[in-house]
Curated annotation (Swiss-Prot):
InterPro entries: Cation/H_exchanger_TM, CPA2_transporter, Na+/solute_symporter_sf. May operate as a cation/H(+) antiporter. Keywords: Antiport, Ion transport, Membrane, Potassium, Potassium transport, Transmembrane, Transmembrane helix, Transport. This is Cation/H(+) antiporter 7. It comes from Arabidopsis thaliana. It is a multi-pass membrane protein. The gene is CHX7. It comes from the Eukaryota.
Length: 801
């Protein structure tokens, strides 16, 4: 570079930088010129002036605006067409369009705007790269690591097969082609493409499921567990390769152990300490946010120097951050909006700028001859993807996952995502891929991310989002198993009723109880939804928690019972009414509960003459939970203290009313669990419908004495006389009503199945008068204000899915 060259000084004066004639040297003034002198610069000084977009700041603003425009164009287009495409494919499509317009004429205005080759730092690309690593960090923050500890053997088998078998198949294909002819691709390119198509990134899978809003379902947890296994296998393979590299192997192995120890014994305890220092309902202090971000940057730089693909450093720190409020939610609320709205679109779009569309159009002509670079790349991608899909679906179906879910699971694990796009950019930087390899691989990512969500939307049944692959009900619970329940509280009036209800179980060392209490608080206005675990967060000294009465009541209950026999966890969920059932169902799914207990929405005065409260929002919530819960559900109609009879020295009297059907069997199983309390007297009223000429024995619900006896038996003795069974033959609903009224004052609690007696003579004529569908015909009769006594009622529905 000649410092005495007039053009060199002219460029430095006007442009702020200069490039040598041979393009090997670049010089820039400091401080850097980032702002334009205005639109008139190029007009007044045509020979030396710059267009405003050639300055760094206007150029960055122009790129951000253009990327946002194209992203939103495709986003709105897909939404208007009811096509469930996530954000990332829309971002990628935006840059493909820009790329096509730019390369139609080499050196065109668009090309100089978006892809300038002036040697200056690429600010937009740098911002996009930061958005990518920040996305990984926030994705790690949003993931509940506790879910990974619950990985089932079948998830491990699926995860192992979905990685190893496709990888081996691709490797065999490469060796076969090499044996029979010359490869157009290098072995390294083959290996990277095969690896990329074989793995299923945990973060990518989680992102897809989150976009489709099924990440918290039982299906979503299963798929994420499978993806976590594939990541673990990849980590073991990479670590094993590093350890076998002679002298560097041992130091790297020691570093891996130190990193794991640092995360487990330092970072994780510090995160928990931050949570405990934050009073419930309060925001996390800024200094703690800065501390977490500084730690993430430190681990990122550490990973950059010792390992490959340093983005994992941010992701691991994200995983080490407890999900949910207060810390995880604070990080997401603070950074996600700007990152997803501004920085990440730059990555999703500009990462596609290396596409060589013109080469691809020429190479397509060779596909019909089954030769050439594009043919080899496309064929290996298709073959490995098909093998992966088939192996995953067959393995899932073999371990008793429903056929439809097995297909969807294979689709999700075969999907390509932002992770694969980032990894492609990484290996291009390492010169392991050229533009041709990147073009084929990146377009395969785009096609996969466009088609997979559409196929999943077509195959997956969203109404089963909270369905479970395991039995979660009272009937299948083993005699000595711990009973896991979730009791819900809306109003202060419900505290006493739910405490009384939990006391019914009388937990012992042989009959343990895990009680999860969820206090549902309705949000008004624009408040932010929160979810608080009172085991993790404590109220600040001098303040009062909105759930203080709930906490005090249940902790007092725990002190009066055997501590080893009962465990109580209390949560508060503050959300909009229309979303309350989602928090409830997700918590039930996460805690693996067998029974959810909901309070009835209506309450009466002591003499039952007036309605004290009638909450329609609560009634709608109960309906939604009954339809979508992953376990059995009970609706508790509380009308008097359950232990009132004991105050007078008598036993607590329970009557289970059964006709037939699975809900009645669930009611019997619940009654059998209560029978372990020696202060409880149990009676079973078996209503037997008389068959009409139009009915057959197979068309009505049926339950004989042997079935009842089988459910009510205990491990202690085959014959147990601590319960009695009364059988009544019924012709119609009016006769059923008379029988129920005749025993109204004999019992303190009635237990009935929600579907008990449906479509039989027992409820004939009653269904037309049923006021509350959620209680069923028999439950509605007992809970009505016309019923003579104030006995409480529990209506049970067995697990639906």
């Amino acid at each position: 570079m000649d410092p005495f060259n007039a053009s060199w000084w002219t460029n430095m004066a006007w442009h702020g930088y200069s490039l040598s004639e041979d393009g090997t040297k670049f010089c820039e003034m400091l401080p850097t010129k980032i702002n334009s002198f205005g639109l008139s610069e190029k007009i007044l000084h045509k020979s030396v002036g710059l267009y405003f977009w050639e300055y760094p700041l206007p150029n960055l603003e122009l790129i951000i605006l253009s990327v946002f425009f194209f992203w939103q164009f495709f986003e709105i287009l897909f939404k208007m067409s009811n096509i469930p495409i996530p954000k990332m494919p829309s971002m990628m499509l935006g840059c493909v369009v820009i790329n096509l317009f730019s390369y139609t004429r080499p050196g065109s205005l668009l090309h100089r705007m978006f892809f300038p080759d002036d040697g200056r730092p690429k600010v937009a690309e740098t911002g996009g790269a930061f958005g990518f690593v920040m996305y990984w960090f926030l994705k790690g923050v949003s993931i509940d690591v506790g879910m990974l500890r619950k990985t089932e053997p079948r998830a491990a088998l699926i995860g192992f097969n979905t990685l190893v078998i496709p990888y081996i198949s691709g490797y065999i294909l490469m060796r076969t082609r090499k044996h029979f002819g010359k490869l157009a691709m290098t072995e390294l390119q083959y290996q990277e493409i095969i690896l990329l198509q074989s793995l299923s990134s945990f973060a990518g899978v989680n992102g897809l499921l989150t976009d489709l809003k099924i990440n918290h379902s039982e299906f979503g947890r299963m798929v994420q567990s499978c993806a976590a296994v594939t990541d673990l296998v990849i980590f073991i393979m990479v670590s094993g390769t590093v350890l076998l590299k002679g002298q560097k192997g041992l130091p790297h192995g020691i570093v891996i152990v130190l990193v794991i120890g640092f995360l487990v014994y330092i970072v994780w305890p510090v995160m928990l300490w931050i949570i405990k220092q934050t009073p419930e309902g309060r925001l996390v202090k800024d200094v703690y946010i800065y501390l977490v971000m500084a730690t993430a940057y430190f681990v990122y730089m550490f990973w950059l120097n010792f390992f490959q693909f340093s983005t994992y450093g941010w992701f691991i720190i994200g995983l080490a951050t407890p999900a949910g409020p207060p810390l995880g939610s604070a990080l997401i609320q603070r950074f996600e909006c700007f990152n997803v709205g501004v920085l990440l679109p730059l990555f999703g779009s500009l990462s596609m700028e290396q596409l060589d569309i013109s080469w691809l159009m020429r190479e397509i002509l060779n596909l019909k001859h089954m030769e050439g670079f594009a043919y080899e790349a496309i064929s290996v991608i298709l073959i490995v993807t098909v093998v992966k899909f088939v192996v995953t679906a067959i393995t899932a179906f073999a371990v008793r996952i429903p056929y439809r879910d097995s297909i969807v699971l294979a689709m999700v694990l075969s999907n390509r995502s932002i992770f694969e796009l980032g990894y492609l950019g990484y290996i291009v930087e390492l010169k392991m891929f050229d533009n041709k390899s990147f073009t084929i691989a990146a377009l395969s990512v785009l096609v996969s991310s466009l088609l997979t969500p559409i196929a999943i939307e077509f195959m997956y049944e969203p109404q089963h989002i909270f369905s479970s692959y395991r039995d979660r009900n009272m009937l299948t619970l083993k005699h000595d198993s711990k009973l896991k329940t979730l009791v819900c509280i809306h109003k202060p009036d419900h505290i006493t009723s739910m405490v009384n209800f939990v006391e019914l179980f009388n937990p012992t060392q042989e009959s343990k109880l895990e009680c999860n209490v969820l206090h549902l608080v309705e949000l008004i206005g624009q408040a932010i939804p929160t979810f608080i675990s009172h085991k993790m967060q404590k109220p600040k000294v001098g303040t009062r928690s909105c759930s203080r009465n709930v906490i005090t009541a249940f902790l007092s209950l725990r002190r009066h019972l055997t501590k080893e026999a009962i465990s109580i966890d209390i949560f508060t969920s503050a959300s909009l009414v229309e979303h309350m059932h989602e928090d409830l169902c997700w918590l039930a799914l996460d805690k693996n509960v067998a029974l959810v207990v909901l309070p009835f929405h209506r309450s009466w005065s002591v003499d039952r003459s007036t309605i004290v409260s009638d909450d329609k929002a609560m009634q709608n919530l109960n309906h939604k939970v009954l339809k979508r819960a992953s376990c059995s559900v009970g609706i508790f109609v509380y009308r008097k203290p359950l232990w009132e009879s004991q105050m007078h020295g008598s036993c607590y009297k329970v009557c289970a009313i059964v006709v037939g059907g699975k809900d009645d069997k669930e009611a019997l199983a619940f009654t059998n669990r209560m029978r372990r309390n020696k202060q409880t007297s149990v009676t079973i009223l078996h209503l037997i419908p008389q068959l009409t000429t139009e009915e057959s024995e197979d068309s009505v619900q049926k339950l004989d004495y042997d079935d009842i006896k089988e459910i009510m038996k205990t491990e202690d003795s085959n014959e147990n006389d601590s319960w009695i069974c009364i059988e009544k033959s019924v012709k119609e609903g009016a006769e059923t009503s008379v029988i129920l009224r005749s025993i109204a004052y004999d019992y303190d609690l009635f237990i009935v199945g929600r579907s008990s007696g449906m479509n039989s003579a027992v409820t004939k004529g009653l269904n037309e008068w049923t006021e509350f569908e959620e209680l069923g015909a028999l439950g509605d009769v007992i809970a009505s204000k016309e019923f003579p006594s104030r006995a409480s009622v529990l209506v049970l529905q067995q697990q639906q899915y």
